[in-house]
């Protein structure tokens, strides 16, 4: 027997059950949708996040650059991050900084009007920390090799 389900149910289930954070913000950068993955990643419930500015998760020192890019995308309707993953720092409710990667989907009304952007995100903090440690180890080994090769 073939299971019956609607396209709408399938899409809703994927967004609700994925471990990835899925956030939709309107043209002004106000959060309008926040899934369970976003709750787990950032520590805010949907009730706390919806209606707030994206500043909620953007570290203060990165906000000017963030808003410059966001406004450009909303004005032009074009983003290069629909095909590429963007890696940026973010901040959790408890103030902890994390590293995230995300892609953007621009959402339009049937009329073609740009409504805002959905971001699909994953926390890559552990991977970034491992890469940093590997780079530090490599630098230390290279320094030792340099010393070994020098005459006494």
List each language-model region with its residue ranges.
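Non-catalytic regulatory/interaction regions at protein termini and inter-domain linkers
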Residues: 1, 69, 139, 143-152
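Sensory-domain boundary/capping and coupling elements
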Residues: 5, 9, 128-146
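PAS/LOV-family and closely related PAS-like sensory domains
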Residues: 7, 37, 46, 55-101, ...
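Sensory-domain boundary capping and coupling elements
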Residues: 102-104, 121
């Amino acid at each position: 027997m073939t299971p019956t389900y609607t396209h709408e149910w399938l899409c809703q289930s994927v967004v609700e059950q994925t471990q990835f954070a899925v956030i939709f913000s309107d043209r002004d950068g106000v959060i309008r949708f926040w899934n369970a993955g976003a709750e787990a990643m950032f520590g805010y419930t949907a009730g706390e996040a919806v209606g707030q500015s994206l500043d909620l998760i953007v570290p203060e020192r990165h906000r000017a650059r963030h808003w410059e890019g966001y406004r450009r995308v909303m004005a032009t309707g074009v983003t290069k991050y629909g095909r590429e993953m963007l890696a940026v720092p973010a901040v959790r409710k408890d103030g902890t900084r994390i590293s995230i990667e995300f892609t953007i989907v621009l959402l339009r009304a049937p009329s073609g009007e740009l409504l805002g952007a959905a971001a699909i995100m994953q926390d890559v903090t552990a991977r970034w920390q491992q890469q940093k440690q590997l780079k530090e180890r490599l630098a230390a080994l290279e320094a030792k090799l340099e010393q070994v090769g020098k005459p006494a």
